[in-house]
């Protein structure tokens, strides 16, 4: 199938992938008086007395806003908020299909951090959570940070944390297959953008000790002058504690794990040959990975994962964000924290039994029917245990 031509045709037929459907009947005078005036005044007054009642008397409890400024849409780049709308609608469809979450797109015509933050904050009383989507770095970090400080609902940048959750799930199972522990491995993360930063932070939170981040300049380390910014400075303090300098090729020597969220062809077969025995390669650049699975295997990699559906072990965010929000909403969480993300990763990893686990099956399939319940329950429990659940 030619997906480009067929998708364009279908979008023309669909004229939007979302619609509003009433949950209540309005076929009699009594129906109208209950759903609207005069009866509707009573829940309004209850919410006025206690804003938390908005979760009980409206659909706020299950509503997520999918927010973008259109500056980093898929691999298309800065195409504008209107052009990003088909992606945001698609994201909302996935929220409903895989998490039973009611999601609505909000495409903002601004690139100003404070303007975007203020816009989302001012309407945050209408929803139970916010999914930030396709916002270019480094502004995505600033927007998420400021919204988390201002809002008392989950603020989640999927391009960062969704990718990190699936990557950690895959890493947990990959380590089981090769018989290594998180404490002993050396991990090289190639890329210093949104996804790379979140992956690095999450695997460190999980207990991985030795992580080196690389960008176009080479290894990121504390004291490096070239090509740094405040976000890389932060990562330099958390990673590469020996302050090693050099190229990506230098850093992967002796590494157990390569995680790429960078550029096509960044890793070569020759570089994989210099890695440790039973190397694990996560080549997640899309649509062309840092290295293709056959090339990585030729270099000695035992496990290879990509972001593509035509190869085994796909890093697919749809395994995370719908069920993650489902779990957060079920306990009316105020935040999505590291504990909840790690719980989601562990739940995903544990869906694959030791008997099923192998080099080509370390991550559940996108359509695995067990994902929603397993992840949402684990996330909800982690929210309770970490003190961010309201109920």
What is the predicted function of each stretch?
Residues 233-302, 308-310:
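Rossmann-like adenosine-cofactor binding region
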Residues 158, 178-180, 283-391:
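Adenosine-phosphate binding glycine-rich loop
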Residues 74, 79-99, 157, 165-263:
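Glycine-rich phosphate/diphosphate-binding loop of Rossmann-like nucleotide-binding domains
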Residues 150-166, 283-286:
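Short, acidic/small-residue loops that bind anionic groups at enzyme active sites
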Residues 105, 131-134, 155-158, 189, ...:
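General beta-strand structural signal in soluble alpha/beta enzymes
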Residues 12, 55-60, 65, 96-97, ...:
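Solvent-exposed alpha-helices and their adjacent loops that cap or buttress functional pockets
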């Amino acid at each position: 199938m030619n997906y480009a031509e067929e998708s364009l045709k279908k979008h023309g037929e669909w004229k939007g992938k979302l619609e509003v459907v009433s949950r209540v009947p309005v076929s009699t005078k009594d129906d109208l008086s209950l759903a609207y005036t005069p009866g509707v005044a009573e829940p309004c007054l209850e919410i006025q007395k206690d804003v938390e009642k908005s979760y009980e008397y409206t659909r706020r409890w299950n509503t997520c806003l999918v927010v973008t400024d259109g500056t980093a849409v898929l691999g298309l780049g800065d195409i504008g908020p209107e052009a990003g709308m088909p992606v945001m609608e698609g994201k909302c469809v996935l929220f409903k299909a895989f998490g039973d979450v009611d999601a609505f797109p909000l495409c903002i015509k601004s690139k100003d951090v404070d303007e975007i933050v203020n816009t989302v904050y001012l309407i945050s009383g209408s929803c139970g959570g916010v999914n930030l989507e396709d916002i270019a770095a480094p502004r995505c970090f600033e927007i998420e940070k400021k919204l988390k400080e201002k809002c008392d609902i989950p603020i989640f940048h999927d391009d960062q944390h969704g990718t990190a959750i699936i990557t950690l799930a895959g890493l947990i199972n990959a380590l089981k297959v090769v018989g290594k522990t998180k404490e002993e491995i050396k991990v090289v993360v190639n890329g210093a953008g949104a996804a790379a930063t979140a992956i690095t932070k999450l695997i460190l939170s999980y207990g991985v000790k030795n992580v080196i981040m690389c960008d176009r300049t080479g290894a990121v380390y504390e004291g490096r002058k070239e090509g740094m910014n405040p976000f890389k400075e932060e990562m330099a303090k958390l990673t590469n504690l020996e302050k090693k300098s050099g190229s990506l090729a230098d850093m992967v020597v002796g590494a157990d794990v390569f995680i790429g969220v960078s550029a096509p062809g960044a890793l070569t077969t020759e570089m994989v040959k210099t890695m440790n025995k039973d190397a694990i390669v996560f080549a997640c650049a899309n649509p062309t990975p840092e290295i293709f699975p056959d090339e990585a295997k030729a270099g000695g990699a035992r496990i290879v994962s990509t972001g593509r559906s035509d190869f085994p072990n796909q890093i697919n965010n749809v395994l995370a964000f719908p069920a993650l929000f489902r779990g957060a909403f079920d306990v009316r969480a105020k935040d999505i924290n590291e504990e909840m993300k790690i719980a989601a990763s562990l739940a995903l990893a544990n869906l694959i039994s030791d008997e099923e686990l192998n080099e080509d099956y370390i991550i559940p399939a996108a359509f695995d029917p067990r994902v929603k319940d397993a992840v949402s329950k684990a996330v909800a429990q982690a929210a309770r245990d970490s003190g961010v659940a309201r109920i």
